[in-house]
Amino acid sequence: LPRIAILDGYPLENHSILANRLIIDDPDGLNQYYQVEDRKHGTAMCSLIVKGDIESRCPYIPSPLYVRPNPDDINRREFVPNDTLLVDLIHRAVKRMYEGENNEAPVAPSVKIINLSIGDPDRCFYHTMSPLARLLDWLSYKYKVLFVVSAGNVYNEIHYNGNEAYFKALNRQEQEVLFTTNILNNRRNWRLLLSD
């Protein structure tokens, strides 16, 4: 039985890391709209949960991963269709897991952790809980589930004003420190993503 769920892009089901480790629930028939090149993000996120960092020696999670694909658009950016409210989409997906839908049985009532990527670059946090945040709080309480919420993908470039040769000469750990410092120095522009 699945213990972890992800609401994100459609993965490649037969990827070497993911084969026989996923339970994909696609009640909206999104599979037909996802081409192979559109499945990179979903595959990467599912692989990260199932196996951890690809370079680490982490063991596979012991149970299958429940996957509820979300819509994607031709620009390959996460989005919610114009005729859908995000709160409705999330509510329907989670309720289907624990209570079922259309007189069907629940599809993943054993899930205790739900990974969700919901960044909205047009709506910054201003110290008031959004309707979606309230919904997640209520769903968490009602179904006794933990939501792991990612702020979403960052499409802005991260600029480095230093010398390219210097950067390339650094080892990986030094590059990561420089990269992270650069992000933290620019956090005023990413309030939604990085809190103080």
Regions found by a protein language model. Name each.
Residues 1-26, 32-86, 125, 144, ...:
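Subtilisin-like serine protease catalytic core
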